[in-house]
Amino acid sequence: MSTRPDAIVIGAGPAGAGAAIGLARGGAKIVLLERSRETGDALCGGFLSWQTLARLAALGIDGATLGGQVVRRVRLFAGARSSETMLPEAATGVSRLRLDSALQAAAVAAGAGLERGVHATALEGGAVQTRDGAELAAPSVFLAAGKHGFRGFPREPAAWQREDPVIGLRLRMPQAAALDRLVGDAVELHLFDRGYAGLVRQDDGSANLCLAVHKSRLGGAPEALLRRLGDDHPRLGERLAFADWSRGIDAIGHVPYGWRDGVTTPGLFRLGDQAGVIPSLAGEGMGIALASAEAAVTAWRHGTAGAAPGFQRALAARMTRPFALANLIWRLGENPRTASPLTACAAAAPWLVRLTSRATRLG
């Protein structure tokens, strides 16, 4: 680099790319580091709420141009019970490949320098260290490494979760007319003992099935677990009948759902999953990524590096309500004794589902 940048952004997912867009449009010299050489289809984040779509629009990305599937309703399945409720506003199902590509292109167009294949591994004395031994320095660093752990920044979930950690799984299901008819314009949540599965159709017509399951339930190969779940839960089994098992199942270990932290040092802005990891059934992971980026950019413009601690405290405070509610629903949903009553309540009081959908957004 010929001149020292004003800021380094680690990670070119929605949080990092969103921050790079805002910073670069404000005239800052930005270096955006991305560990992968090509944009991939990340495991999490296929659901974009109405609020997330509005944040994308503020960055100049029209949700309609992403070509996603319109999502108008949410379905719950628990045992023999089910519910279906209209969402407060229309959402979208879109692949992370499509979303991340659009955000990265916007960041480059805004003037950010995107450097691919650079794996940042640690922060020491305000400098970013990379796997190949390089050291990059800037007055401010925006840490947006997603769900990947980052050396020196442990993310410890609650004690009960540490005893039985959560694994994230994802199965891509090819487009099929019968599956389209089954799922339609819904995002589905299939609740089961010690876990849940979320299903939504995406931009290319495929369906994204993501699971959060405790390690004690995994008991072996992910495919074997999915097949058992399909046998035990007929509605999920109907969907899994369209699976192409040759595609393989993506996995990420020890996801610290429910963790959040409001502590940082001057010059370090922690974004997205590096600030807090909301249970994925809330469908707000991408919302938090973009909202944290927006808030960090605003704070930086007013106070540069020194604004980081205040930004982090304020972001953690904003996370309090949606995280508490999402954690409660998660615990109820993965417990067989409470999942069915929860679903019955959703069927009897759809207004409560819509209220919860709004309350789990980051205000």
List each language-model region with its residue ranges.
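Conserved Rossmann-like nucleotide-cofactor binding loop
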Residues: 15, 38, 148
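Predominantly flavin-linked oxidoreductase catalytic cores and closely associated redox partners
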Residues: 106-239
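Beta1/beta-strand and adjacent pyrophosphate-binding region of the FAD-binding site
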Residues: 2-15
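FAD/FMN-dependent oxidoreductases across multiple families
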Residues: 217-288, 292-299
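C-terminal helical "tail/cap" subdomain of flavin- and related membrane-associated enzymes
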Residues: 298-363
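Redox-cofactor binding/interface segments in oxidoreductases and associated redox assembly factors
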Residues: 10, 143-144, 270
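A conserved beta-strand/loop capping segment in the N-terminal third of enzymes
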Residues: 52-104
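Glycine-rich FAD pyrophosphate-binding loop
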Residues: 12, 21-44
